[in-house]
Amino acid sequence: MHQLLENLSGNGMGLLIPLGLSWLIWTILLPKQQYRGKLFNDRARFEWFYTKARRRFLENGGVILNNAFKKSENSFYVMTSREVEIVLNPKYMNEVRNDDRFAVTERVDQLLHGDVPGFGIIKHSAQTHKIFSNTFQSRVVREIGTFLVPIFEEIDHFLETQWTDNEEWHAFSLHPSMVQLVSQESTRLFLGPEMCRDAHWLQASVKYIQSFFMGIDLLDSWRPIFRPLVSKFSKTGKQIRSDLAEARQILSPFIADRQARKAKGEKFNDLLQWFDDAARGAEYDAPLLILRSSMAAVHSTSDLLTKAIFEICTQPGLIDDIREEAIRVFKEHGLRQTAIQELRLTDSVLKETQRLKPLQTTAFIRLTKEDVVLSDGLEIPKGTPIRISNHHMWDPEVSEYPNADQFDGYRFYKLRQVPGQEQTAQLATVSPSHTGFGLGKHACPGRFFAATATKVILCKILLDYDLKLLDGQRPKTMWRGDAQVPDPMCQIVVRRRKEEFNLSSLLHDVK
């Protein structure tokens, strides 16, 4: 409740009484209407409301889920930062993943408040959603190899200007830097060379992403009927709409100019053009699809890169091996897609990072559209939000991976040498044992682009820089619900090194 008081501006104070009453109903009565069974993280003794239970999950969700599975093997109800959900054991993945009785789109719309003004970048018409998914699943996969040089140019430019050529040790916070880097290199693919170094656009898009997630935390405590009002009169809600309007103001004239140039016969080759190709003349909201693409790329790729760099900073031998692989592969293949496919150790390090510290510790976010009885008799009532745990990837008691709770950067490199594992052990490949990118028909459509970009970025950084953790301090574990997020304040120390092989020299060979 105090969060809303801090957010409400003067003209919203008149809503305080009705919103306060709704909050009381939501925190006391509604949870008992949402589930059948025992709530694992119920209110503590002398707690009248569920506010603190929600807050505890927001701040320590991964630990709560881990403790719950120690006491309830198959499933349990949990109060998340938003509402009561049922969390299922990973053994149900194959049964649930393609079952249309479990709605994906509707649940994602709920979680991201797609009906609230300012949050609609995820909620699209069926036609627009098809444009988005088909473009990433087919066109991006087909074209990504032709974009290696432009993407590399942006990585090179960012590191030269932001990390600099300073040969003395200097420190900075890693995660914000990775957010900026991924934003610049992904914009080269999304909007072409005119926008990828536009400081106004890069700042606006990242600012919107950050305010978007702040807004989710604010709205999660309120019933859906009141969320538009909370958003309308809160400082956070106003900031989200302002940031969205700013992003549109930048993109709209750019897109209009693009259309005028196309009418004169000029050709373009980037994500915006591919969306147009997939639309085949149908109307769609291009700025929203670009923002959605940017959010997906920046949020997930910067998370994976940050966690991977934190891990390998403590393993100089692994860093040396990655450098040796990069030199050998790029000397032989140049900046081509065949080189990316041969970066097997780099791929392994990233896949291992995602296995041990995925973006979220649960997957398969769904909403039951009808009463469901699973094969072992487990009953899930209609309208129940569900999610499936990913703990089979890192819990040594249930995982198929040896020493599953330990980081082994060579794990998947070695697995790819086992007959039958050549394909399944790759970063972009999904399987029941590794669900970092999901599983089934709803697996992340942008994972091939993410895998390519992260490998190029990691190799370029390690070839050009020495790096270590500041004072040798490993980053502390931070939770946002079930997501283990990088510590935004954790710093690394870097210095420019005299690389054994200059990747930038390959630009001339390709051109």
Curated annotation (Swiss-Prot):
It is an enzyme of class 1 (oxidoreductase). InterPro entries: Cyt_P450, Cyt_P450_CS, Cyt_P450_E_grp-IV, Cyt_P450_sf. The chain crosses the membrane at residues 10-30. GO terms for cellular component: membrane. Glycans are attached at N7, N502. Gene3D superfamilies: Cytochrome P450. GO terms for molecular function: heme binding; iron ion binding; monooxygenase activity; oxidoreductase activity, acting on paired donors, with incorporation or reduction of molecular oxygen. GO terms for biological process: mycotoxin biosynthetic process; terpenoid biosynthetic process. It is a single-pass membrane protein. It holds the Pfam family p450. Belongs to the cytochrome P450 family. Cytochrome P450 monooxygenase; part of the gene cluster that mediates the biosynthesis of paraherquonin, a meroterpenoid with a unique, highly congested hexacyclic molecular architecture. The first step of the pathway is the synthesis of 3,5-dimethylorsellinic acid (DMOA) by the polyketide synthase prhL. This is Cytochrome P450 monooxygenase prhD. It comes from Penicillium brasilianum. The lineage of its organism: Eukaryota, Fungi, Dikarya, Ascomycota, Pezizomycotina.
